[in-house]
UniProtKB/Swiss-Prot annotation:
Pfam families: DIE2_ALG10. Dol-P-Glc:Glc(2)Man(9)GlcNAc(2)-PP-Dol alpha-1,2-glucosyltransferase that operates in the biosynthetic pathway of dolichol-linked oligosaccharides, the glycan precursors employed in protein asparagine (N)-glycosylation. The assembly of dolichol-linked oligosaccharides begins on the cytosolic side of the endoplasmic reticulum membrane and finishes in its lumen. The sequential addition of sugars to dolichol pyrophosphate produces dolichol-linked oligosaccharides containing fourteen sugars, including two GlcNAcs, nine mannoses and three glucoses. Its main location: endoplasmic reticulum. The chain crosses the membrane at residues 54-74, 139-159, 162-182, 184-204, 205-225, 234-251, 274-294, 312-332, 351-371, 392-412, 440-460, 465-485, 498-518. Belongs to the ALG10 glucosyltransferase family. It comes from Kluyveromyces lactis (strain ATCC 8585 / CBS 2359 / DSM 70799 / NBRC 1267 / NRRL Y-1140 / WM37). The gene is ALG10. It catalyses: an alpha-D-Glc-(1->3)-alpha-D-Glc-(1->3)-alpha-D-Man-(1->2)-alpha-D-Man-(1->2)-alpha-D-Man-(1->3)-[alpha-D-Man-(1->2)-alpha-D-Man-(1->3)-[alpha-D-Man-(1->2)-alpha-D-Man-(1->6)]-alpha-D-Man-(1->6)]-beta-D-Man-(1->4)-beta-D-GlcNAc-(1->4)-alpha-D-GlcNAc-diphospho-di-trans,poly-cis-dolichol + a di-trans,poly-cis-dolichyl beta-D-glucosyl phosphate = a alpha-D-Glc-(1->2)-alpha-D-Glc-(1->3)-alpha-D-Glc-(1->3)-alpha-D-Man-(1->2)-alpha-D-Man-(1->2)-alpha-D-Man-(1->3)-[alpha-D-Man-(1->2)-alpha-D-Man-(1->3)-[alpha-D-Man-(1->2)-alpha-D-Man-(1->6)]-alpha-D-Man-(1->6)]-beta-D-Man-(1->4)-beta-D-GlcNAc-(1->4)-alpha-D-GlcNAc-diphospho-di-trans,poly-cis-dolichol + a di-trans,poly-cis-dolichyl phosphate + H(+). PANTHER family: ALPHA-1,2-GLUCOSYLTRANSFERASE ALG10 (PTHR12989), DOL-P-GLC:GLC(2)MAN(9)GLCNAC(2)-PP-DOL ALPHA-1,2-GLUCOSYLTRANSFERASE-RELATED (PTHR12989:SF10). The lineage of its organism: Eukaryota, Fungi, Dikarya, Ascomycota, Saccharomycotina. This is Dol-P-Glc:Glc(2)Man(9)GlcNAc(2)-PP-Dol alpha-1,2-glucosyltransferase.
Length: 533
């Protein structure tokens, strides 16, 4: 983390008799030497703690990855052979469109599909790449697209370079096990490769593996490709562009503690370096605008059931899911007490915030017909049994939960943001040497991008929360505090990393048990249906 740069201005001491002073140093000199040695010892101990944490993290990833991969591959095998050897829910549309491409019908489009053809083009490539080496069914081969992406490309190609720059922040193997992604490794859905391409765009922008210019253009290209899987990824292109500009502006324009000035410096740097930093992403925005004008909607196909609106409660749903999945990251005595102290010290402010949330619940809640009609999704039961159980429950129970979730979302990020000196410039002079952290500018951009991607959607769909969680999680440094107790002042995030990985696998296990245990029959479907996210 970039912190305030402190310059040591203390003097050791001056002696009237040089000879005597060498033999008999003053008390001030002794104290100064002692303090210096103590500081050096602290630095050495801290470095050892960091080194130990990094080494343990590397070993943990190397050990856990093959175990998790074998488990996911086994589950994929059982589902494709006995558990689910037929198309499931939206797969009927995705597989149908891919089959049209495989038959050479490139201009035929399934009217029920709402996303661009990125997945179907990738499925076409996957099929032709594997048809000579396997006699598996077409459905199995197409599902293999997401399994390969989830257990190989996602942790090793996308997350590994980011991990090398933020080894204390996250483990790639943990994010590989993230439940909202892992559940779709076995199905033919758009979410896995949508996430892979847009986070790879972030990876290229931060790590710069091909040099600055080439990496930024490749980042923009990956961002554009990601929009072929999900249109709302254009919003995350904005965040990545802001990060690209910001990481250079903070060095060349000398960011300080005056936030408004930093915004002005960012704008000025954007204008001065438009061609090299902004143009690659501006091309994406121009192409997306052309698509909107041509299609007259952000949605392809079934526009009537996917009309954009102002579903602000969706933002609280997203924060609630983020808080739930990140329990091992934030749960501690300090977070709990600070939230309670905030309430006790300023109850009026707390009640006004709750009132604001209740008003949003009242006037900006959208209940889509699909939510109430499709009992094959966990959200159906969450809304029926919890969120929309009754008016009393909706306002008196869910509003405080939303409030606490928002508090967790903000407070966990706060210690991980960069801090600048009010006067002194940043010592780092190359963007690639900067830590993977947000500033107050990119932090605000992250919140706004999350809001813009989830609020317009009328559907209560947890898959839409994958990228808000991933982008939030990648920029967080794991808290060193124990789960319950006083801070010990050491770098000790390993237990939390292990707990986070275990937490994800427990959730995956529960969702798999629900999937296998409960069979649902629909009159319109000839096959047995199951429950997924």
């Amino acid at each position: 983390m970039i912190s305030s740069q402190i310059q040591d201005g203390e003097t050791v001491g001056k002696y009237s008799c040089p000879t005597a002073s060498k033999r008999y140093p003053s008390d001030a000199a002794i104290m100064s030497v002692s303090e210096t040695e103590e500081k050096n010892a602290v630095v050495v101990e801290f470095s050892r703690d960091v080194e130990r944490e990094v080494v343990v993290g590397i070993y943990a990833n190397v050990i856990i990855w093959p175990i998790a991969t074998a488990l996911f591959c086994y589950l994929a095998y059982t589902l494709n052979t006995t558990g689910l050897p037929y198309v499931f829910i939206d797969e009927k549309f995705h597989v149908d469109q891919t089959l049209r491409y495989l038959r050479g019908k490139w201009y035929s489009w399934n009217g029920k599909i709402t996303t661009p053809p990125g997945l179907y083009l990738l499925g076409w490539l996957q099929y032709h790449a594997t048809r000579f080496i396997t006699n598996w069914s077409t459905l199995t081969v197409l599902r293999l697209t997401n399994l390969i992406g989830g257990v190989i490309v996602w942790p090793w190609v996308v997350l590994r370079p980011l991990y090398l720059f933020n080894a204390l922040g996250f483990w790639p193997v943990t994010l590989m096990c993230f439940p909202l992604m892992a559940s779709y490794y076995f199905l033919y859905y758009t979410d896995i490769w949508s996430t892979i391409f847009i986070v790879e765009s972030l990876n290229l922008a931060l790590v710069l593996p091909f040099g600055e210019t080439a990496s930024i253009w490749m980042s923009a290209l990956c961002g554009l490709i990601s929009c072929l899987f999900r249109q709302t990824n254009i919003v995350w292109n904005v965040l990545i562009m802001i990060l690209v500009v910001e990481r250079r502006a903070m060095i060349e324009k000398n960011f300080n503690t005056l936030n408004f000035n930093n915004y002005l410096k960012l704008v000025l740097h954007t204008l001065e370096n438009f061609k090299s930093l902004v143009l690659p992403y501006a091309i994406n925005f121009g192409l997306f605008l052309a698509f909107l004008l041509y299609n007259r909607s952000i949605t392809l196909g079934d526009k009537s059931n996917h009309v954009a609106g102002l579903h602000i409660v969706q933002f609280f749903y997203c924060l609630m899911f983020i808080a739930f999945f990140s329990v091992p990251v934030w749960f501690s005595k300090q977070v709990t007490l600070s939230y309670l102290i905030r309430f006790v010290m300023n109850p009026v402010k707390y009640l006004l915030e709750l009132l604001g949330i209740m008003l949003i619940i009242r006037y900006f809640t959208v209940v889509h017909p699909f939510l109430l009609a499709d009992n094959r999704h966990i959200t159906f039961y969450l809304f029926k049994k919890l969120i929309g159980r009754s008016s009393l429950f909706k306002y008196c129970v869910m509003a405080p939960i939303y409030h606490f979730s928002a508090y967790v979302y903000l407070e966990v990020m706060r210690p991980s943001t960069m801090i600048f000196h009010p006067i002194l410039p940043i010592e780092i002079k190359n963007p690639i040497d900067l830590p993977i952290q947000l500033t107050h500018i990119s932090w605000t951009a992250l919140i706004m991008c999350t809001f813009m991607t989830v609020v317009p959607s009328p559907l209560f769909e947890p898959r839409y929360y994958i990228l808000p969680f991933i982008f939030w999680r990648l920029f967080i440094t794991m808290a060193p505090e124990p789960f319950w107790g006083n801070p010990i002042g050491k770098v000790t995030g390993t237990k939390r990393h292990l707990s986070e990985c275990a937490w994800f696998m427990i959730i995956n296990l529960i969702t798999y048990i629900i999937f296998k245990r409960f069979d649902i029959k629909w009159e319109s479907e000839t096959t047995v249906q199951h429950i997924i996210w």
